[in-house]
Regions:
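Transmembrane helical cores of multi-pass ion-transport proteins
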Residues: 1-253
């Protein structure tokens, strides 16, 4: 629901803060698909200012959770919840990317924020599939999957970006192919940083956004601490849950 440069700037700043102050030595903070539905709904109803207010409030709640030592609660979450949580995130990301993978054209019809609504929209507009777009997307997936079989030093995602970007550029330049959109075709990414400013705090808006802020805080806490727990199992380290929560809160503020 927001422009790409906002996501890039947020990822860099928040990732730096979480890595600097976080309670896990190997965890890196960044954007996640679990928040897509929530963020989209907030932007649609309250605009970007509402999203800023909700995120700021969520940051305050996360810091408070860390100060009150609520990070230890992660120990009581059943393991099947961890598995279901991870699978749910994967399914959410998959669902949100279907339209772009298939190059669908919805004719100006807004994309619903809920899971079922998205799939109903996809089925209604399946006839608008852009096959050239789908071919490039499937090529990316194949390169990412197959590259590790030949070289584990070079990331498959990097190979896919380089090879297919060059291929699409060559086809557009020398063969006149226009079926595949680039990021530049869809968005205008400005190079300058936006001026930092506090959002307008309206008490009525804050009260209506509190449930959303609480959801963001709880989801962020659970996802961050579950990821840290999984990382502990791989590295043998032990993270500090409360420090991690406060770092996540500072990054959101």
């Amino acid at each position: 629901g927001v422009s790409p440069e906002k996501g890039i700037i947020t990822a860099v700043v928040a990732g730096f803060v979480v890595s600097l102050l976080g309670g896990s030595r190997v965890q890196i903070g960044g954007p996640t698909g679990a928040f897509i539905v929530i963020v989209y709904g907030v932007v649609q109803q309250y605009g970007e200012t509402g999203l800023l207010v909700a995120t700021f409030m969520a940051g305050v709640l996360l810091v408070a959770m860390g100060l009150f030592k609520l990070g230890a609660v992660i120990r009581f979450i059943p393991y099947p919840v961890v598995v279901g949580f991870t699978a749910g995130i994967a399914l959410t990301i998959f669902t949100t990317q279907i339209a772009d993978l298939f190059g669908m054209n919805f004719g100006g019809e807004p994309v619903p924020g809920d899971f079922i609504g998205k799939w109903m929209l996809y089925f209604r507009h399946f006839g608008s599939v852009n096959w050239a777009n789908l071919a490039v997307g499937m090529g990316s997936i194949l390169l990412i999957v197959l590259t590790p079989r030949f070289s584990r030093r070079i990331p498959g995602s990097l190979v896919a970006i380089v090879v297919l970007t060059a291929g699409v550029w060559a086809l557009r330049t020398y063969a006149g192919m226009e079926g595949v959109d680039t990021i530049g075709d869809r968005f205008t990414i400005r190079a300058e940083l936006p001026a930092a400013a506090m959002p307008a705090m309206d008490w009525e808006v804050m009260r209506s956004l509190f449930p959303v802020a609480l959801t963001i805080a709880l989801l962020g806490a659970i996802e961050s601490l579950l990821s840290a727990t999984v990382a502990d199992g791989v590295t043998g380290d032990r993270h500090d849950s409360n420090t991690e929560l406060m770092a996540q809160g500072a990054a959101n503020r």
